């Protein structure tokens, strides 16, 4: 098993993979879109690695910027019906904190990404809520109502969910929905 890989980004392949050169060996690693967007040719990166061996015996390496992303992936794939592709689609759009917050607050709209359907969302919420609460990750849900209302407001203004969530993450905790929307709009106008 590979725990981490540290090396130089040799090439960005497709929309979700890089070739990471470590000691003269190039590893093809799939990354969440949020992580991949920060990778450029020549960058030195350290990734936490999950290895998946498919039914056909072909191995796939999944890379994460931190342990939180890796642990979130591990939690998601334990849910019946969630495979690596589905979990990566979720992590392409949401940070682990946003995933945990959506689970605890039962925010179905936040989890409806990458073709994830209502039945699977229900299963994710029902199977992971006790686990998320057990690890006290529900501290991320403190601002969920404000965030959910702010996302809805930004969506109604024509922004995409990914952009809205990214802007709200950058502005951090706000006192009110209005304040969150105002700050997010300033962030989006940059």
Curated annotation (Swiss-Prot):
InterPro entries: DNA_helicase_Holl-junc_RuvA_I, NA-bd_OB-fold, RuvA, RuvA_2-like, RuvA_C, RuvA_C_sf. It holds the Pfam family HHH_5. Its main location: cytoplasm. Residues 1-65 are annotated as: Domain I. Residues 142-190 are annotated as: Domain III. It is found in: Cytoplasm. Residues 137-141 are annotated as: Flexible linker. Keywords: Cytoplasm, DNA damage, DNA recombination, DNA repair, DNA-binding. GO terms for biological process: DNA recombination; DNA repair. Residues 66-137 are annotated as: Domain II. GO terms for molecular function: ATP binding; four-way junction DNA binding; four-way junction helicase activity. GO terms for cellular component: cytoplasm; Holliday junction helicase complex; Holliday junction resolvase complex. The RuvA-RuvB-RuvC complex processes Holliday junction (HJ) DNA during genetic recombination and DNA repair, while the RuvA-RuvB complex plays an important role in the rescue of blocked DNA replication forks via replication fork reversal (RFR). RuvA specifically binds to HJ cruciform DNA, conferring on it an open structure. The RuvB hexamer acts as an ATP-dependent pump, pulling dsDNA into and through the RuvAB complex. HJ branch migration allows RuvC to scan DNA until it finds its consensus sequence, where it cleaves and resolves the cruciform DNA. Belongs to the RuvA family. NCBIfam families: PRK14600.1, ruvA. Homotetramer. Forms an RuvA(8)-RuvB(12)-Holliday junction (HJ) complex. HJ DNA is sandwiched between 2 RuvA tetramers; dsDNA enters through RuvA and exits via RuvB. An RuvB hexamer assembles on each DNA strand where it exits the tetramer. Each RuvB hexamer is contacted by two RuvA subunits (via domain III) on 2 adjacent RuvB subunits; this complex drives branch migration. In the full resolvosome a probable DNA-RuvA(4)-RuvB(12)-RuvC(2) complex forms which resolves the HJ. Has three domains with a flexible linker between the domains II and III and assumes an 'L' shape. Domain III is highly mobile and contacts RuvB. This is Holliday junction branch migration complex subunit RuvA. It comes from Anaplasma marginale (strain Florida). The gene is ruvA.
């Amino acid at each position: 098993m590979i725990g981490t890989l540290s090396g130089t980004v040799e090439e960005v392949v497709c929309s979700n993979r890089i070739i990471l050169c470590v000691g003269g060996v190039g590893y093809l690693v799939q990354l969440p879109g949020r992580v991949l967007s920060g990778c450029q040719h020549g960058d030195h990166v350290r990734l936490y690695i999950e290895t998946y061996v498919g039914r056909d015996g072909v191995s796939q390496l999944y890379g994460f910027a931190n342990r939180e992303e890796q642990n979130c992936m591990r939690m998601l794939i334990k849910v019946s019906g969630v495979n690596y592709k589905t979990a990566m689609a979720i992590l392409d759009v949401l940070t682990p904190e946003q995933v945990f917050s959506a689970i605890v607050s039962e925010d179905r709209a936040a989890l409806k990404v990458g073709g994830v359907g209502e039945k699977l969302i229900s299963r994710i919420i029902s199977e992971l809520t006790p686990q998320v609460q057990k690890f006290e990750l529900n501290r991320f849900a403190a601002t969920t109502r404000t965030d959910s209302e702010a996302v809805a407001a930004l969506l109604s203004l024509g922004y995409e969910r990914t952009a809205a969530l990214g802007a709200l993450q950058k502005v951090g905790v706000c006192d009110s929905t209005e304040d969150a929307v105002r700050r997010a709009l300033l962030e989006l106008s940059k």
